[in-house]
Structures are given as C-alpha cells and as structure tokens.
C-alpha cells in the first residue's frame, strides 16, 4: 500500500491504484510494506510503529515468528524500493515519479541500520502484548526471590564511605 497509490478526497479514502505489488503471500509482508512507506516520512519512528502495529495486531494477531522477521522484511522492502528506483531511473530518466520514494527510502534504511534488532523485537513484542523479552518475567521473579551468596563479609550499606577524587 504505497501512499502515493491511495486516492482520497476531503472525507477519506476513495480507492487504490497500481496493484502491481499485489500477490498472495504471508500477511506479515503486508505489514512490512505498509510500515516501510509509513516510516519513510515519520518524525517519530517508534510512535508510528506503535500506532500501525497496534491497529494491525488488533485485527490480526502477530506470532513471535512474524515479529522476529519484521525488521528484516521492512529493510528488504526498502532495498527493493531502492533497486527498482535505480532501475527505473536508468530506463525512464525523465520520469521523476518512478523514483519518488528513493530519498526517503535511503533515509529510513540508514535510520533502521542504527536500531538494535533485539531492541526492535522487544518493542514490537511489547506493542503486541507479549513480554518484551521472552520469559523475562520468569527471570525477574527468579532474581527477586533467589537468595544470592554475599560477595563481601560486611554490609556495604553499613560501612563508612569516603569519596576519593582523582582529578585536579
């Protein structure tokens, strides 16, 4: 759903054009394509991500496997956009529309390269109602309830402390 292919009037969406990308494929690909275009001009990637994924997940629950694949699928769609743009510019150099998404796609792919994939997965898992890190509640409960051996033979809280400064 490239936003340049949506026909709107003052009230709302009236139709879609250019079904060249329409194929039968896993539904997660539709979300990845929608996110790749929505995030291109987003001022707040995580807010946009949250709004779209939350709405999508309310209608189609994402599985853990789909969540783990999402960042790679978004980047793949951006790479495809860039390849097609370069190819079409060579074939039709006078048609600026064929490379209309190129600048924004480069910007977004560079932004996404800075995002830690595990952080991205944790954010999406949280948006979808999962624990951000699988089994994190079990680990947190274990840490809270486990009696660890003392590292020192004294209590750090009950020890006189002196701050030593090493600068001039």
Language model features with spans:
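Active-site acidic catalytic loop and adjacent metal/ATP-binding pocket
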Residues: 1-29, 154-156, 163-164, 168
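Alpha-helical structural motif
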Residues: 27-30, 66, 78, 101-108
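Generic secondary-structure boundary/loop-capping signal
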Residues: 3, 21, 59, 94-95
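Conserved ATP-binding subdomain of kinase catalytic cores across diverse folds
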Residues: 61, 65, 168
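ATP/Mg2+ or Mg2+-diphosphate-binding catalytic cores
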Residues: 81-167
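Active-site activation/catalytic loop segments of kinase-like enzymes and analogous catalytic loops
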Residues: 28-61, 77-92
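Amphipathic, non-membrane alpha-helical segments in soluble helical-bundle scaffolds
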Residues: 21-24, 42, 46, 72
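All-alpha amphipathic helical-bundle segments outside canonical DNA-binding/catalytic cores
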Residues: 64-74
């Amino acid at each position: 759903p490239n936003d340049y292919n949506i026909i709107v009037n003052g009230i709302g969406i009236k139709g879609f054009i250019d079904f060249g990308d329409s194929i039968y494929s896993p539904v997660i690909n539709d979300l990845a394509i929608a996110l790749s275009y929505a995030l291109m001009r987003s001022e707040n990637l995580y807010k946009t991500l949250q709004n779209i994924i939350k709405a999508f997940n309310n209608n189609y629950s994402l599985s853990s496997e789909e969540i783990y694949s999402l960042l790679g699928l978004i980047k793949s769609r951006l790479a495809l956009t860039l390849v097609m743009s370069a190819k079409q510019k060579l074939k039709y150099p006078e048609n600026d529309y064929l490379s209309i998404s190129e600048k924004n796609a480069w910007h977004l792919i560079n932004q996404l390269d800075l995002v830690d994939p595990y952080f991205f997965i944790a954010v999406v898992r949280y948006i979808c109602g999962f624990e951000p890190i699988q089994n994190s509640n079990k680990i947190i409960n274990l840490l809270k309830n486990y009696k660890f051996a003392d590292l020192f033979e004294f209590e750090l809280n009950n020890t006189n402390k002196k701050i030593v400064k090493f600068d001039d």
